[in-house]
């Protein structure tokens, strides 16, 4: 399970973890710069994040896995499936569509991005290097504004994939999600009506009703 970026963390994925652990071994990891995971010293790339995920998988199992990712975590999931097809048997990607520079502009500004905001006071208690938080935001702005998730990536994904999104998602607009779905060879599409980016927090029952049968079919 791969959570969303910046404001995201494993606590947002609790409902998935609770449901999945009844039938599956669940591996939930915090990505670089989130929770107790270090930011690192090398430039941020989804290839690097995919290798992080593979390292965690290898530490737990040598079997192939199902990857469920949300937002930033879904883009990482796409890359894991592309680079390591033999290790990913299924994938659920939530809130992540086609992306090229210029389609959106990401800025981590405003009151919620005040380092003294209570949200960040709590998050910094977990961080190994809390003094790097603001620079991490600036680096992530640059990363998100230059990232590419295009036909070459999506057509390289061979595993069975469920592309899921909220109808009103402004981070990954509906048209971009449909484009991703159409480019992934073995994919299914689920759109949750009248929900936004964090669709599973608005209507988890509807999201789970799409995911559960997808996972249960061999």
For the regions a protein language model found, what residue spans apply to each?
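Short beta-strand/loop motif that positions the catalytic acidic residue
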Residues: 157, 163-165
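Conserved HGGG/HGGXW glycine-rich cap/lid loop of the alpha/beta-hydrolase fold
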Residues: 1-36
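Catalytic active-site module of serine/aspartate enzymes centered on a nucleophile-bearing elbow/loop
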Residues: 194-218
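Acidic catalytic loop of the alpha/beta-hydrolase fold
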Residues: 168-172
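Flexible "cap/lid" loop of the alpha/beta hydrolase fold
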Residues: 75-83, 89-121
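Conserved acidic catalytic loop of the alpha/beta-hydrolase fold
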Residues: 47-65
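Active-site nucleophile elbow and catalytic-triad environment of alpha/beta-hydrolase enzymes
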Residues: 137-153
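Catalytic histidine neighborhood in serine/cysteine hydrolases
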Residues: 177, 181-198, 213
